[in-house]
A protein has these predicted regions:
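Extracytoplasmic small-molecule ligand-binding "clamshell" domains
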Residues: 27-105, 264
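Bilobed "Venus flytrap"/periplasmic-binding protein-like clamshell domains
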Residues: 43-48, 59-74, 106, 127-184, ...
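Acidic, polar ligand-binding/catalytic clefts
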Residues: 70, 79-143
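Periplasmic-binding protein-like
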Residues: 45, 123-130, 212-250, 268-279
């Protein structure tokens, strides 16, 4: 009788010990947040319809990524803080611990995955915006770009793609691509409208927004490539927050929460995804 009680007591104690060791591990991610009770998202509000200021250059940050990251925070029972950050400073801010997550229309890329964890959420791909009539007959990132002038956002994956094509052009004896890199997408658009470049390489969602605002002057080149690229949210490498975010994003996609946000900003909910191949 006493031996049975002893066994039961030991078993209960063992379970309690195991639960005690598991519970803190599950809560560690909250202890590591930049601000207690808040999910801080580094975001570059210069990229409609993904993220932009409600008043153009000031006010509340809105857009698909802003709303989706807010939905994520709500799912995790946290407040959301949108921390406006320059494009080239997004990943450095994350690795320096100034934000918990970077949810702001960044490609899932090997370069970024080398220093951060990525959680895919939307299929996308680059496109080319050109002057109406496409006078240089550019179709995509291909030999059609050799000898042309192309604008890109500096430090973006698209910049890397165009630089790679420039090398291919030159290695095959063709004229290279004159690449102009700008800090902001709006500056690439201004360069195209002012005739300084022949085309802009941007994500498909940005291309659509650019053309919608300049329908009489610009168009999307007929051609597409790398259609299986994904946008991804980034978290510090090896963080306890990563699996939490991944699970929450999967839930928000499966229950239709993020699909409603996509429709709100005229994005295709069929492109929502939880997997992706890095470029």
């Amino acid at each position: 009788m006493n031996s049975k009680k002893s066994i039961i007591a030991v078993s209960v104690a063992t379970v309690a010990l195991l639960l005690g060791s598991i519970a803190p591990a599950q809560a560690d991610w909250k202890a590591d947040l930049v601000t207690k009770g808040t999910l801080t998202n580094c975001i570059d509000p210069e990229y409609p319809p993904m993220e932009y200021y409600s008043n153009g250059t000031s006010g509340k940050i809105i857009g698909f990524d802003a709303d989706a990251s807010a939905a994520l925070a709500k799912e995790l029972k946290l407040k959301i803080k949108q921390l406006a950050t320059s494009f080239d400073g997004l990943i450095p801010a994350l690795t320096a611990g100034r934000c918990d997550i970077v949810w702001t229309a960044l490609y899932l890329s090997n370069k970024r995955l080398a220093v951060a964890d990525g959680v895919p959420y939307l299929e996308t791909g680059p496109g080319v915006v050109v002057a109406k009539g496409n006078p240089k007959k550019i179709s995509d990132i291909s030999f059609s770009m050799c000898g042309t002038r192309i604008a890109v956002q500096g430090a973006s994956a698209n910049e890397g793609l165009v630089k790679a094509q420039d090398k291919v052009c030159q290695d095959t004896g063709k004229k290279g691509i004159a690449i102009s890199s700008y800090p902001k997408v709006a500056e690439t658009v201004a360069a195209l409208l002012n005739g300084k470049v022949d085309g802009i390489v941007e994500t498909d969602v940005a291309c659509g927004d650019i053309v919608n605002k300049n329908a009489k002057k610009l168009e999307v080149a007929k051609g597409y490539f790398l259609g299986d690229v994904s946008f991804a949210a980034y978290i510090q490498k090896g963080s306890d927050l990563t699996p939490v975010v991944r699970k929450a994003v999967e839930k928000l996609i499966s229950n239709g929460t993020i699909a409603k946000i996509a429709k709100k900003y005229n994005l295709d909910p069929e492109k929502l995804t939880t997997v992706g191949e890095p470029i």
